[in-house]
Amino acid sequence: MLAPKKVKFRKWQKGRLRGLATRGATVAFGDIGLKAVQHGQLTSQQIEAARIAMMRHIKRGGKVWIRVFPDRPVTAKPLETRQGSGKGAPVGWCAPVKPGRVLYEIKGVSLDLAREALTRAAHKLPVKTVIVVREGI
């Protein structure tokens, strides 16, 4: 799973995602990518599950780039605990995603194979996505 080595704060406020992605909104490394069209949070487990689904489909060919990194802690209280008495303990990491953000990119395989791999990855994610092809291909 992806996780940061060091963070400034152990617990963050949840916050609210507004607006469109300004950074990471174009296909930069690969030929084809998976772009989010909805706000949401991707946990490190979801990012990894989508990566595995892609890699199993493209087998040994091609290269995959993961363009998001889970750097925000997610907290949870234990089950059957009453509310109050502070914020829960950190249980994992998530990456906040805005519409327009490219999540994954693939290069080195045919576009049809890459499309199918990205579709399989999209089924593992909690946000709606579209497949985008880099201009000039």
Curated annotation (Swiss-Prot):
Entry annotated with the keyword tRNA-binding: yes
Highest rank taxon of the organism: Bacteria
One record GO biological process: translation
InterPro entries noted in UniProt: Ribosomal_uL16 (IPR047873), Ribosomal_uL16_bact-type (IPR000114), Ribosomal_uL16_CS (IPR020798), Ribosomal_uL16_dom (IPR016180), Ribosomal_uL16_sf (IPR036920)
PANTHER family: 50S/60S RIBOSOMAL PROTEIN L16, LARGE RIBOSOMAL SUBUNIT PROTEIN UL16M
Self-association and partners: Part of the 50S ribosomal subunit.
Family to which the UniProt record says this protein belongs: Belongs to the universal ribosomal protein uL16 family.
Listed name of the protein: Large ribosomal subunit protein uL16
Organism in which the protein naturally occurs: Desulfovibrio desulfuricans (strain ATCC 27774 / DSM 6949 / MB)
